[in-house]
Curated annotation (Swiss-Prot):
This is Small ribosomal subunit protein uS8. Signal peptide: none annotated. Part of the 30S ribosomal subunit. Contacts proteins S5 and S12. SUPFAM superfamilies: Ribosomal protein S8. GO terms for cellular component: ribonucleoprotein complex; ribosome. The lineage of its organism: Bacteria, Pseudomonadati, Pseudomonadota, Alphaproteobacteria, Rickettsiales.
Amino acid sequence: MPNSLIADAVARIRNGQMARLREVTIYHSRVLVEIAALLKEEGYIVGYEVIEIRPSVKRIIIRLKYYCGQPVISKLKLFSRPGKRIYSRACEIPKFYGGLGISVLSTSKGILPSYKAVSSNCGGELLFGVY
């Protein structure tokens, strides 16, 4: 099991997009389910499904999205990692790719995209950016 489930999930999604895979499998956690739901809501993935391999062992299957043969996710950049956490107040949340992409934050209100965190005046840990 990797040290950071979020970093592992971001790497698997990025590698799956570069290899033009239809779906990737990532480890299961409540945070990763919230992240998958957010990516689906924002239109970056087709969908996700939680499967149970055996009792108490679950995985998340993420179906990747393509448009005209090109991946919808062109950049996926990890901000925080276990050795260096990056926190931001609501007024200081950076724009990812000049506002074309979104930054994903872990806040007290759950996992939120940058524009929802700013509108609800809620800062938190910057997890990754997607464009």
